[in-house]
Every structure is written in C-alpha cells, then in structure tokens.
Amino acid sequence: MHGLFISFEGIDGAGKSTHIAGLADAFRAQGRAVTLTREPGGTPLAEKLRDLVLNDAMDSLTEALLIFAARRDHLVRVIAPALVRGDVVLCDRFTDATFAYQGAGRGFDLAVLATLEQWVQSDEGLLGDPAGNFPMKPEVETVIEPHLTVWFDLPPEEAALRLQGARVPDKFEAQPLEFFRRVAKGYSDRQQGHPERFARINASQPRDVVWQAVRQVFVAKGWLA
C-alpha cells in the first residue's frame, strides 16, 4: 500500500491539532498505520532545533538554516521511512510554513528558501536508498512534498482572540498582528502557486462544521470512506 504524506497549515490559533487527531483516528479505523509528527520537530535532534527557533533570538538566515536542518533530519529519520512502509503521515506544518513565516512574515528571500527546499527535500537517497545519501549537486529534479496540504484559513484578528491567555507565547506567537497578516498572505500565495496540492478550509466556522469540511476533502479523494 502506498504511503500518504499530508501536511496541515495555518496561523497559530487556526485549530489544526484537533482535526489532525480526528483524521488519525479515522485512518486507523480503516486499518491504516498512521505516523503523527510536526515541524519544526519530529526527531530528538529536530526538537532541540525547534526549541532554539521558537525561543532564541537570531538573524533570519540562521533561523531558516536551523529550520531546514531540522526538516532534513525529520525527512531522513521519520517521514521517508514511514512513507516507504506505507504509513499515512500527518504532519503539523511543513515547508509551506517556512515560506509563510520566514518568507512572508520575516521578509526573508523566497529564492533562497526555494533553493534550500530543493536541496533538503530531494528524494534521492530517501525513498529509494536506505543510506539516505545526500545528493551532491544543485540540480535536483524532484523533492519530497505532501500529497495534500490542508490549509486552515483564519483571519489573523480572529486567531489573536482565540489565543488570548491560552499559554505563554513563543517568539512567533508574540509577534504583532501585522506579522500574522503577512503570514496569512504568504499562505494565500503558496496556495495560488500550488492549487493542485492545497485544500483551503474556512477555519472561522464552528468546529464541527470545520471537521466535516476537512473529512469531505479526504472522502472526495477516496482516502476515507
């Protein structure tokens, strides 16, 4: 059985986590093995890098490099092996978040992010070679990317209200509203650039309505009954 790689995107407060858990239960009820993971993170090394990225001050290039370093380890140790096994991989954020937060939010060069994406996410040595050899050439033809990205689209103003008093914010959650407006625009731009991969969900709706919309995306693809 072929593996499925599904990512979930949206600004903080959009409600991704609840629906990721619901989808994991739905896939398991159909007998599928599920790998639940997140970014930055997903491995011991990547979780250490996550803590640095979320809490330590650094320049934008350092931040981007740490995120992609965490992503490479995550791909090598978790995502690629799970896909080879035939698992359904449900990942809370992936590269689209980097383009939205670091690119649109921080104003980091999108061309540099695209180059890092090509290098780090090359499928050479991951889906075919268990050794995970790194491709020592810049011309990478294919990259590992989600089969589907579920984007929980929520206005930044509404997200801010949901997060009030929820927890101590990390350095991203503590950013001003204008930052999240740029991030939301970044997600919209990514959807427009990859319409075949993105499924936009109106996350402003009641939770049960959002869940039905999410589930219907998977039913329509024949992945859930």
From Swiss-Prot:
Reported EC number(s) for this entry are 2.7.4.9
Task: Give the record's keywords alphabetically.
Answer: ATP-binding, Kinase, Nucleotide biosynthesis, Nucleotide-binding, Transferase
Q: Which reaction does it catalyse?
A: dTMP + ATP = dTDP + ADP
Q: Which GO terms describe its biological process?
A: dTDP biosynthetic process; dTTP biosynthetic process; dUDP biosynthetic process
Binding residues for ATP: 10-17
This chain's function reads: Phosphorylation of dTMP to form dTDP in both de novo and salvage pathways of dTTP synthesis.
Its recorded name reads: Thymidylate kinase
Per the UniProt entry, what species is this protein from, by scientific name? Polaromonas sp. (strain JS666 / ATCC BAA-500)
Q: Which gene encodes it?
A: tmk
